[in-house]
A protein has these predicted regions:
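Conserved N-terminal substructure of TIR/SEFIR domains
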Residues: 1-102, 127
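Cross-kingdom TIR/SEFIR domain
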Residues: 66-70, 89-190
Length: 191
């Protein structure tokens, strides 16, 4: 059993299953709620979800969020806004990352085309890398595409360079994607 600082336990039987409706859902089994954990939580959110809305919001993310939130035991932050292109990441979102115990990064074909997602990723790596609390999910992309920035990830970075985003920022995003892609995670082709 793996313990979370909020003093409840997530059992090791975490995994994906296919239901009779043929969708994927993540099952977490939560238990053991000491009273002090409920009164003085260390983290505002147990999980921060980072995802590209156009790829996953109405399908995979909605099911994942539902499963995480089902027992009201795992407090999950999910940004519900559809963002306009070029919008900067909000201070509230940066704060939500800082106040989260764990981040689930859902890397999908268009993830890297969003500067917002990449800025989120940089903040997640900054806050959580040392604690080993980042879980990547490779949704419709091979981990090697993310790690090496090939395919749609290469195309996205070509577009970012054409938009005159600083070389330093682009290199930071690439380094962060590589770090996250090298972590143990889940690949949707194995669900």
């Amino acid at each position: 059993m793996e313990s979370i600082d909020r003093s409840f336990t997530i059992r090791a039987d975490v995994g994906f299953c296919s239901s009779h409706e043929d969708f994927m859902c993540l099952h977490f089994a939560a238990a053991d709620f000491p009273e002090e954990a409920l009164s003085t939580p260390r983290w505002k959110h147990d999980v921060f979800l980072s995802f590209r809305g156009e790829d996953t919001r109405k399908g995979f993310i909605s099911h994942l969020h539902h499963e995480l939130d089902y027992w009201q035991a795992i407090k999950t932050f999910k940004d519900n806004r559809d963002l306009e292109r070029g919008t900067s990441i909000s201070p509230e979102l940066l704060c939500a990352i800082e106040e989260s115990q764990l981040a689930i990064i859902v890397l999908s074909p268009n993830y890297a085309s969003s500067t917002w997602c990449l800025d989120e990723l940089t903040k997640v790596v900054e806050c959580m890398e040392a604690r080993d609390t980042i879980l990547p999910i490779f949704y419709g992309v091979d981990p090697s595409q993310v790690r090496n920035q090939t395919g749609s990830f290469a195309e996205a970075f070509t577009e970012h360079k054409e938009k005159l985003i600083t070389k330093k920022k682009v290199e930071q995003w690439k380094a962060d994607l590589t770090k996250v892609a090298n972590l143990c995670g889940w690949d949707s082709k194995n669900f």
